[in-house]
Curated annotation (Swiss-Prot):
Protein family (similarity comment): Belongs to the universal ribosomal protein uS5 family.
Gene Ontology CC terms, in alphabetical order: cytosolic small ribosomal subunit
Classification via InterPro entries: Ribosomal_Su5_D2-typ_SF (IPR020568), Ribosomal_uS5 (IPR000851), Ribosomal_uS5_bac-type (IPR005712), Ribosomal_uS5_C (IPR005324), Ribosomal_uS5_N (IPR013810), Ribosomal_uS5_N_CS (IPR018192), Ribsml_uS5_D2-typ_fold_subgr (IPR014721)
Parts of the chain that traverse the membrane: none
Species lineage: Bacteria, Pseudomonadati, Spirochaetota, Spirochaetia, Leptospirales
Protein name: Small ribosomal subunit protein uS5
Superkingdom in the source lineage: Bacteria
Residue ranges of every copy of the S5 DRBM domain listed in the record: 11-74
SUPFAM superfamilies: dsRNA-binding domain-like, Ribosomal protein S5 domain 2-like
One protein family per Pfam: Ribosomal_S5_C
Alphabetical UniProt keywords: Ribonucleoprotein, Ribosomal protein, RNA-binding, rRNA-binding
Length: 168
């Protein structure tokens, strides 16, 4: 149990969205809640989770547990991302562009939460299409999963780093 307590301390959590939904039954409406959360260690690991329950705290707890189970390693070094990337999920599109040190995170609330939890400090973003926070967060995670360090890109293509940067 102590191991689990230590593990939970190193991750920071952010609730992106809480929604009340209703199921119409013969006696009226039965309300429940769902929550979308982002969890990250601010050193390159980030995850998103979705939880549903009859009470808000239970939905939040479930979403955070789900996010911790679905952590993804993001390939970046330093303060920004190595290259421009576009993430897609359903009709949501998110573009992430590297920026110079000191720029900060230029992003909407949904994109900002996942980029901050990943540990990226300087990035320019633009989202279009669906404005649903669930779709935007998943599109952002898709974009972050596409990131490659120059070493990985060169290895994948079977060329040297010098050739990758056009110095050969």
């Amino acid at each position: 149990m102590a191991y689990q307590d230590e593990e939970s301390k190193e991750y920071s959590e952010k609730v992106v969205k809480i929604d009340r939904v209703a199921k119409v039954v013969k006696g009226g409406r039965r309300f429940s809640f769902n929550a979308l959360s982002v969890v990250g260690d601010q050193r390159g690991k980030v995850g998103i989770g979705f939880g549903k329950a009859n009470e808000v705290p239970d939905a939040i707890r479930k979403s955070i547990e789900s996010a911790k189970k679905h952590l993804v390693k993001i390939n970046f070094k330093g303060h920004t991302i190595p290259h421009e990337v576009i993430g897609k999920f359903k009709s949501a599109r998110v573009i992430l562009k590297p920026s110079t040190a000191g720029t900060g995170i230029i992003a909407g609330a949904s994109v900002r939460s996942i980029v901050e939890k990943a540990g990226i400090q300087d990035v320019l973003t633009k989202s279009w299409g669906s404005s649903n926070p669930v779709n935007i967060v998943k599109a952002t995670l898709d974009a972050l999963e596409q990131l490659e360090t120059p070493i990985l890109a060169a290895k994948k293509r079977g060329i040297s780093l010098n050739k990758l940067f056009g110095k050969d």
